[in-house]
Amino acid sequence: MDVLLGAAAVAAYGAIAGYLVLNGAPNVDEGFYGLTARAAVSGLVPYHDFGYTQMPLFPYVHGAVSRLVGFGPVEQRMASGLWALLAVAVGTVFLWRRFGRAVGIGFAALLVTTLNWVYFTHLPKTYAFVGAVILVNIVILEARADFRGRMFWTSLLGVVAVGSRLPVAPFYAVVWLGLLSRDFSAANLLRALGWPAVFTLGLLAPFAAAAPRPFLFWALDFPWQSAALKYWRLDLPALFYFAPAVCLAALALGIAILSGRVRLARTRDVVLLGLLVALACNVLPVGAYEEYATPLLPGLALVLCATLGDLGIGARVVGAFYLVLCLVNLCGIPPIDPTYYADTRKASLYVRQFQRGAFPFVGSASVVALEAGRPVDPRMLMGSFCCTEDYPESQANLLRLMTPAGIAAHMEDPRCEVFVLYNRANWNFVWSMPRFQPISASAVSRWKAILSRDFRLEYGDAHYAVYVRRGVYEGK
């Protein structure tokens, strides 16, 4: 029976994940995550050789997996999904062994039916990997009682997680303080300070040393300056729609804890507090999106399920509870776009046909460069987010950014035979980094003039516009 249940769970997850890999709506970030991963495993260094809006470790992790499966958009989604699968598997096995089949299978069902979580963890972003790291860390904290082991693994995995996605730092700050406060001694303080310092020096310091100014710009200045100009706030109904069952269960657990009906196991209270603090820091500030909760959901689900397991409720009641939660989850539907991958393949065929030689791909639709297997100027790896009018040419080059003049020079180069744009205006070169102010009308007019004079529209669909240089088109 256990084997059959496990096989059914794997089949259900595979069906949902496979559908969303092929039919999930495109995300503007997919191109630059894939290009930076490809660049990192080819020998280029984040910040020193190319711009990158996150901390530096993820391109190497994602690039290593993508090297096995491929760098196309579908392969990128599959590579990211492997980390989501790891999180589901580790959490399920841990809970199954400790609390029984019902709790373990329930955890898997809870995550797999959170369709927005499945969708966003199968985009080539940091969410799936960082979520898996956090979940593994929580499992270690649940399984080990010694301070040394807990702090060592929390320090190592914390540097890996924060070194991939900075906004999860509040979780590790709370857990670090909680672990130290409960087992405080001079020796433990030395360990708590020493291990994070050693891992930070080993994993992150080399990037800062290689390119100090670009490192500070991309890792700290860019998110700070860009966030200052965002004006929207995420409302709580949007968060509940994103992950209905996890949010509802967390609310119920919070009420039970505050009323004194439930007491959390040692260390689990610190973990839950860390997750909630990190969740608040990620979704409450101005300019937040509900997807920022994605890497925290597996850990939150594991804490909820482990607490349910501690209550010792019968398997049938637990199963009924999970069934209700899974039905609630069906209220949150991710964005679907069945034509995205087919259109990307078509656009890439035109790039392969008309772009001769090794001249880099030019255009904002960087995901097409991935599908076509084309090289890209390191200053343009960020795709839609590579252009700046905030800095002069010399400083932009230092920060590995393009200027409008640099893009125009690429367009006017006779070796640039194809130019590809998105058919969504705000996904193109419309924002000046990092302040997200509109690119000047004069720069846009110059680009349009070059496009009209030197190129013709060869292919267009709902997602892309592929322009081919006139002489090249006539020669074909």
Model-derived segments and spans:
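Short acidic/glycine- and proline-prone juxtamembrane loop motifs at membrane-interface regions
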Residues: 27, 122-129, 289-290
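Transmembrane-helix motifs of polytopic, lipid-linked glycan transferases
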Residues: 78-99, 113, 136
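Hydrophobic/aromatic-rich transmembrane helices and adjacent perimembrane loops
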Residues: 82, 130, 170-171, 279-313
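Hydrophobic, aromatic-rich transmembrane alpha-helices
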Residues: 89, 242-268, 272-279
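Specific aromatic-rich, kink-prone transmembrane helix
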Residues: 90, 110, 129-146, 152-158, ...
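Membrane-interface alpha helices of multi-pass inner-membrane proteins
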Residues: 108, 135, 150-166, 172-178, ...
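Perimembrane helix-loop-helix junctions
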Residues: 151, 171-198, 254-264, 302, ...
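Extracytoplasmic
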Residues: 167, 325-475
